[in-house]
From Swiss-Prot:
A Gene Ontology biological process term: translation
Protein task: This is one of the proteins that bind and probably mediate the attachment of the 5S RNA into the large ribosomal subunit, where it forms part of the central protuberance.
GO cellular component, one term: cytosolic large ribosomal subunit
Gene for this chain: rplR
Pfam families the record matches: Ribosomal_L18p
Record family assignment: Belongs to the universal ribosomal protein uL18 family.
Keywords annotated in UniProt: Ribonucleoprotein, Ribosomal protein, RNA-binding, rRNA-binding
Keyword Protein transport: no
Claim: Ion transport is one of the keywords in the record: no
Matches recorded under CDD domains: Ribosomal_L18_L5e
Protein name: Large ribosomal subunit protein uL18
Domain of life per record: Bacteria
NCBIfam families in UniProt: L18_bact
One example GO MF annotation: structural constituent of ribosome
Length: 117
């Protein structure tokens, strides 16, 4: 089993458990150059809020889009948008990525901005 398929396997297992709980989930995806985050409805069929380093408003603040500062900016923007829509509590789905570095920076920034998980 290679690294990618192991990550996808971990993500699938966690996603299944969160679906059983019926919780709104904060999903994170990380690529070498960008960070993406979405808040997905409990039924899994609707993206309620999204933010990424591809957005012009976030990119203008940053020098590089693939570091911890960029991840923190995405987390803060996502949390602000979620709170505007009345979403205060989510479950964190790290998509099989290790809770370290950019994933952790995004989560910490979202918590500081007011999201609970």
């Amino acid at each position: 089993m290679d690294k990618k398929s192991a990550r996808i396997r971990r993500a699938t297992r966690a996603r299944r458990k969160l679906k059983e709980l019926g919780a709104t989930r904060l999903v994170v995806h990380r690529s070498p150059r960008h960070m993406y985050a979405q808040v997905i409805a409990p039924n899994g069929s609707e993206v309620l809020v999204a933010a990424s380093t591809l957005e012009k408003a976030i990119t203008e603040q940053l020098k590089y889009s693939g570091n911890k500062d960029a991840a923190a900016a995405v987390g803060k923007a996502l949390a602000e948008r979620a709170l505007e829509k009345g979403i205060a509590k989510v479950s964190f789905a790290r998509s099989g990525f290790q809770y370290h570095g950019r994933v952790q920076a995004l989560a910490d920034a979202a918590r500081e901005a007011g999201l609970q998980f």
